Amino acid sequence: MALKIRLRQQGRRNHVVYRLVLADVESPRDGRYIELLGWYDPHSAVNYQLKGDRIFHWLSQGAELTEKAAVLIKQGAPGVYSELMAKQAARKAAVCQKRRAYRQRRSLKRAEAAKAAAK
C-alpha cells in the first residue's frame, strides 16, 4: 500500500478549499483518506494550517509528496521541508559514496586481471 500526501478538493463552486491528506495512491482524488494533515484556503486571509509533526512522521515512514503538496509544505512548514531535503541529500550522498567505492574496487580487480593476463 503506497501512500501519498496530496490535496483533496472540498468546498463549493467558485470557492474551493483543499485538505492536505494522507491517502492511498489508488484512492480517488476526493475519496477516502487515512489522516487529515491540514487545510489550504486560497480565498481567505489565513491561507493554510498544517500539522508539521504528523507530516514529518508520515514522510519518515515513506509517504511521498505530490508536487502541489510539496509547494504548500515548503511555504507552510519550512522546517519540515528543509529537514526532508537534508535527509534526501544525505541518502543520495551515501548512495554516491557506495557507488564510487564499488567502481574503485571493480577497476582494481580489472587492473589485476589485466596484469595477470599480461604475464
Swiss-Prot record:
Gene Ontology molecular functions:
structural constituent of ribosome
What are the entry keywords? Ribonucleoprotein, Ribosomal protein
Q: Which domain of life is it from?
A: Bacteria
**Which Pfam families does the entry mention?**
Ribosomal_S16 (PF00886)
Q: Does the keyword Ribonucleoprotein apply?
A: yes
Q: Which GO terms describe its biological process?
A: translation
Q: Which SUPFAM superfamilies match?
A: Ribosomal protein S16
- Would you name any one GO CC term? small ribosomal subunit
Q: Which family does it belong to?
A: Belongs to the bacterial ribosomal protein bS16 family.
Name of the protein in question:
Small ribosomal subunit protein bS16
